[in-house]
UniProtKB/Swiss-Prot annotation:
Keywords: Isoprene biosynthesis, Nucleotidyltransferase, Transferase
SUPFAM superfamilies according to UniProt: Nucleotide-diphospho-sugar transferases
Protein known as: 2-C-methyl-D-erythritol 4-phosphate cytidylyltransferase
Organism field: Azoarcus sp. (strain BH72)
Biological role stated in the UniProt entry: Catalyzes the formation of 4-diphosphocytidyl-2-C-methyl-D-erythritol from CTP and 2-C-methyl-D-erythritol 4-phosphate (MEP).
């Protein structure tokens, strides 16, 4: 029977090591305002009324998860210890793990564990704007800076026109079966939208904002802390 009321599942790949942070601890567990970084990410997803369940995909040997108390996030949160060596592997493993629960018409929102400044209005806007879309899409922001293409010696080879260029963010939201098939067929993709594009489809860009940053380098932790400390709960 067709599901006329599709559900929304979040998948958070969190099996990476975060080597660019220069820390022995995986970056998703680095402290941020007294909690693991990923706690802030999961908290927003679990509190979102649009989201039915939140699946966090961890590495098989993750020993850090059990050292923290996640009970305050409620029953929506489900850890899956099936992560792979790449983001795409982890997302695909998560999709396969929930095959008994998700149906073809359900939506899946994939969100970076290292984007702890996701806000409720980001989720609300994404879900509302993509509700009737045949493909799905992703949060993104127009590129503001001038871009330079470098040669092999770090000299400027060309200036890249920034017109029509967008910086991809997450969540990225697609139908369950469409996303699973795209990832099963794709090779060398860095995000879900790339896999959907490789399948010949065109994801929609939903404009987000710069506060939804990804923590990649140590300075980003300080920026994330500032954003969370100064957030009012009302979209600016």
């Amino acid at each position: 029977m067709q599901n006329f009321h599709p559900r929304h599942f979040a998948i958070v790949p969190a099996a990476g090591s975060g080597s660019r942070m220069g820390s022995e601890r995986p970056k998703q567990y680095l402290p941020l305002l007294g909690k693991p970084l990923i706690y802030h990410t999961l908290s927003v997803l679990c509190a979102a009324p649009e989201i039915d369940k939140v699946f966090v995909v961890l590495s098989v040997g993750d020993a850090e998860w059990g050292r923290h108390d996640w009970r305050a996030l409620g029953p929506k949160l489900v850890p899956l210890f099936c992560g792979g060596p790449t983001r795409a592997d982890s997302v695909l493993a998560g999709l396969r793990a929930i095959a008994g629960e998700a149906v073809q018409s359900d939506w899946v929102l994939v969100h970076d564990a290292a984007r702890p400044c996701l806000a409720p209005w980001h989720i609300d806007k994404l879900v509302r704007e993509l509700a009737g879309d045949e493909v799905g899409g992703l949060l993104a922001v127009p590129v503001a800076d001038t871009l330079k293409r470098a040669d092999g010696h770090r000299h400027v080879a060309a200036t890249v026109p920034r017109d029509s260029l967008w910086q991809a963010q997450t969540p990225q939201m697609f139908r369950y079966v469409m996303l699973r098939r795209a990832l099963e067929s794709a090779t060398d993709v860095t995000d879900e939208a790339s896999a959907i594009e490789a399948a010949g489809l065109r994801p929609r860009l939903v404009q987000g904002d710069a506060t939804n940053l990804k923590v990649t380098y140590p300075l980003d932790l300080h920026l994330a802390e500032w954003i969370l400390n100064n957030r009012t709960g009302v979209q600016q």
